[in-house]
Amino acid sequence: MNSRGLILTLGVVIAVAFAQQDSEVEREMMKRKSAYMRFGRSDGGNPMEMEKRKSAYMRFGKRSSGGDEQELVGGDDIDMEKRKSAYMRFGKRSGPQEDDMPMEKRKSAYMRFGKRSSDMEVIGNEGVDGDAHDLFKRKSAYMRFGKRSMGEEEDHDMMKRKSAYMRFGR
């Protein structure tokens, strides 16, 4: 009888521990589900939150040509233009939009974030105006974190760039 009582007590303790573990797992699943629903798919939920998620998805992801796209209002048209211009600035450009932005602006944005053509060619095209200062800023940023070319004079500013180059470069 003593062993039966011990087995029964042990069974109750195991059942209680298992029930508590299930509730903790369930609570953790609810937290994860809540976070998942906030940033991903959901089973319906609040329509206002659904619109926010859809809007964020459209801003940073693919856009489908479904019926929901037809419900654009004035503010959404502006959002669409912003998305298009951001895409044009940092992504591929195609046909008619290419003429919307002057060649100089596209070239400088490309130079800032991508490969650069020879510095002398750019300096020759820009002359002495505000763009020359912009070129110097781009050149110094390039020199700070990458290879250096062209012999510049060694002044205090150059020594700063050189030490930063030595820290982050080869």
Curated annotation (Swiss-Prot):
It comes from Caenorhabditis elegans. The lineage of its organism: Eukaryota, Metazoa, Ecdysozoa, Nematoda, Chromadorea. Residues 42-51, 63-81, 93-104, 116-136, 148-159 form a propeptide. Residues 1-19 form the signal peptide. One of its GO terms (molecular function) is receptor ligand activity. Pfam families: FARP (PF01581). It is found in: Secreted. The modification Phenylalanine amide is found at residues 39, 60, 90, 113, 145, 168. Residues 159-170 have a biased composition (Basic residues). The modification Pyrrolidone carboxylic acid is found at residue 20. The gene is flp-6. This is FMRFamide-like neuropeptides 6. One of its GO terms (cellular component) is extracellular region.
